[in-house]
């Protein structure tokens, strides 16, 4: 028989009593009343905040959006196959946040900041709220530095500045994403952090974009946020805010950043889906009344900060897809009114072989010359006007049989300018190359070159300058302006290439 020692038992009991922690953990808990279509109706959760994260018992997270008298409407961020009627839900007391920092560069993440590229965890301790206030007027400075896209027609006629919001709008398959990707590739060596947000895209398309960025060496300064078409509507709605939060972190550190939202039409559709399922009253085109605010609070976060705030910037290039070129629909007009200009891509121009298919007539940059380098500003002043006049003349000349010499000359120059502005995809040009090409067209130096040979001429001119006149390229890239010496070198080079082409 085991002998029991009362003193040992009493000492154990005393020790346990001494170590007893009588703290009570209080958590705000509710019960799922109804679940379906990515929406949960929850009873309880009395102290929950609007926009607060809630956690279901299977670990799925949701966001409380509708706070009603007798229930809370929450959207689920994920499949939530384990959530059912009667499941418990607890409020977390937190608003959605996302990891940020240097370690994010080169990674592909979902809208919650979790890596989806199979390259392991992201080692960063910093985080930032997905929704945050845009900088106020005092914290901002007017846009004055160029954000070179590497696309001649944009940099010459519709210049974009650091801190600007420039909308890229057009029908499907007109090259909207191509312009955005070219702009990212052109930031190589410029110390600009790029964020590409893909909303509602096919996963294969996003994988293709990531591969192009990797090939061109652009992924090392780019972060990709992907909410593909198969993801929950809540994640598609959140993705642009996540992209903005990641870029803001770098902006407040004094860096220049570029964010591409591809595209906000899909985000608006996801928000409409969520709102209708939450039984919010529909408005025009069945969108909820606050869909304008959904986009304005996102795009207002783009800014050029003042010196006292570190002089960082966030440039936003939102993309909107139109139906049959209708820019007067609800979402396109909303975003046009929020942004500082738009680049309109036309399906007709695209199909006629003009790439990038920019309709110069209705494309505009409301920042304009303030964000242009002196070199391109000096020569591109008349370019937009000449092309707009050419479009009118071309339409008119279809009905005229005999045209006077001046009109024929103007039509000829317009055709050559059109050809000069054609550019291959993923092949952005530097400032010196753009200046050379535009100068040749605007000054009428290639009026004798046959129209079908203009593209070949532009390629040969760029090659000639790189090999024979490296000092010209270096000088334009450093000084960013044209002087008489540079102009004479340029004229000489253009005439040299032209004469060798015409002689062949």
From Swiss-Prot:
GO cellular component terms listed in the entry, alphabetical order: plasma membrane-derived thylakoid membrane; proton-transporting ATP synthase complex
UniProt keyword annotation of Lipoprotein present: no
Catalytic activity: ATP + H2O + 4 H(+)(in) = ADP + phosphate + 5 H(+)(out)
Major enzyme class: translocase
A Pfam family the protein falls into: ATP-synt_ab_N
UniProt cross-references to Gene3D superfamilies, sorted A to Z: 2.40.30.20, ATP synthase alpha/beta chain, C-terminal domain (1.20.150.20), P-loop containing nucleotide triphosphate hydrolases (3.40.50.300)
Bilayer topology annotation: Peripheral membrane protein
SUPFAM superfamilies: C-terminal domain of alpha and beta subunits of F1 ATP synthase (SSF47917), N-terminal domain of alpha and beta subunits of F1 ATP synthase (SSF50615), P-loop containing nucleoside triphosphate hydrolases (SSF52540)
Subcellular location: Cellular thylakoid membrane
Keyword Metal-binding: no
Binding annotation for ATP: 170-177
GO MF term list: ADP binding; ATP binding; proton-transporting ATP synthase activity, rotational mechanism
Assembly and interaction partners: F-type ATPases have 2 components, CF(1) - the catalytic core - and CF(0) - the membrane proton channel. CF(1) has five subunits: alpha(3), beta(3), gamma(1), delta(1), epsilon(1). CF(0) has four main subunits: a, b, b' and c.
HAMAP family linked: ATP_synth_alpha_bact (MF_01346)
Name of this protein: ATP synthase subunit alpha
Underlying gene: atpA
């Amino acid at each position: 028989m085991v002998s029991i020692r009362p003193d040992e038992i009493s000492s154990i009991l005393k020790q346990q009593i001494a170590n007893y922690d009588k703290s009570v953990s209080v958590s705000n808990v509710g019960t799922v009343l109804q679940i379906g279509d990515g929406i949960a109706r929850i009873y309880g959760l009395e102290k929950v905040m609007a926009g607060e994260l809630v956690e279901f018992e299977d670990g799925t997270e949701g966001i409380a959006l509708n706070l009603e008298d007798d229930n809370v409407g929450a959207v689920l961020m994920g499949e939530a196959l384990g959530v059912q009627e009667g499941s418990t839900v607890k409020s977390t007391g937190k608003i959605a946040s996302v990891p940020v920092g240097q370690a994010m560069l080169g990674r592909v993440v979902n809208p919650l900041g979790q890596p989806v590229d199979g390259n392991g965890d992201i080692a960063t301790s910093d985080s930032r709220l997905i929704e945050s206030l845009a900088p106020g007027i005092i914290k901002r400075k007017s846009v004055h530095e160029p954000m070179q896209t590497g696309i001649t027609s944009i940099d010459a006629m519709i210049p974009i500045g650091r801190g600007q919001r420039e909308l890229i709008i057009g029908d499907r398959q007109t090259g909207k994403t191509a312009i955005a990707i070219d702009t990212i590739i052109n930031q190589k060596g410029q110390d600009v952090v790029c964020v590409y947000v893909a909303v509602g895209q096919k996963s294969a398309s996003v994988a293709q974009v990531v591969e192009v960025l990797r090939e061109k060496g652009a992924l090392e300064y780019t972060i990709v946020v992907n909410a593909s078409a198969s993801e929950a509507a809540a994640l598609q709605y959140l993705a642009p805010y996540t992209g903005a939060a990641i870029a803001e972190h770098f902006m407040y550190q004094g860096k220049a950043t570029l964010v591409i939202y591809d595209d906000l039409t899909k985000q608006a559709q996801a928000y409409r889906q969520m709102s209708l399922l939450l039984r919010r009253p529909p408005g025009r085109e069945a969108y909820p009344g606050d869909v304008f605010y959904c986009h304005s609070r996102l795009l207002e976060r783009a800014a050029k900060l003042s010196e006292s705030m570190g002089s960082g910037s966030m440039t936003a290039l939102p993309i909107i897809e139109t139906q049959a070129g209708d820019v007067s629909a609800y979402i396109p007009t909303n975003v046009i009114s929020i942004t500082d200009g738009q680049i309109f891509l036309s399906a007709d121009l695209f199909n006629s072989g003009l790439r990038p298919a920019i309709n110069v007539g209705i494309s505009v940059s409301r920042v304009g010359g303030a964000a242009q380098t002196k070199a391109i500003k000096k020569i591109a002043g008349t370019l937009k006007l000449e092309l707009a006049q050419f479009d009118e003349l071309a339409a008119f000349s279809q009905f005229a049989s005999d045209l006077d010499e001046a009109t024929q000359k103007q039509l000829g120059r317009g055709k050559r300018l059109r050809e000069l502005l054609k550019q291959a995809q993923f092949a952005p040009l530097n400032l010196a190359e753009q200046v050379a090409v535009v100068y040749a067209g605007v000054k009428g130096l290639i009026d004798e070159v046959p129209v079908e040979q203009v593209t070949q001429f532009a390629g040969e001119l760029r090659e000639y300058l790189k090999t024979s006149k490296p000092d010209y390229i270096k000088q334009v890239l450093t000084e960013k302006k044209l002087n008489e010496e540079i102009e004479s070198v340029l004229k000489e080079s253009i005439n040299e290439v032209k004469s060798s082409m015409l002689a062949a």
